């Protein structure tokens, strides 16, 4: 299974490689890990205490999370999901296997919506930014085309019938 691109019959045909990556499992689960790191950093910064009164989240744990943020163990997560039937908890477990010192703080105080909903917002924002950038390029190229051919006469059409003269540049706008 490819994890670096989103696959469907439509995406295979019509989506750019950039868009396929934005909606890929890799992007999704790496974003989950970034969110868990951000959560741990915030809990550390705010001085969250454990039951003994010490820091609940240490910088050593955060560094361990960062060291494994990119290397997702899909096989462990897949096997764990068969057991717990929960995608978020299976990835918490898989991440914890890679980060034994930080295992207890991954997803600490969060709900599944924390990673799920925030990741959806991040992915949609990035996808819309990509569409915006590509659309700006199309508009720019169309404007260049219209200016290049602003004086080239051609016949206009209305209801598929020949009409008055116009220019190719005007027809492009």
Question: Which functions belong to the PLM regions below?
Answer:
Residues 1-173:
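A helix-coil-helix interface module used to build multimeric assemblies
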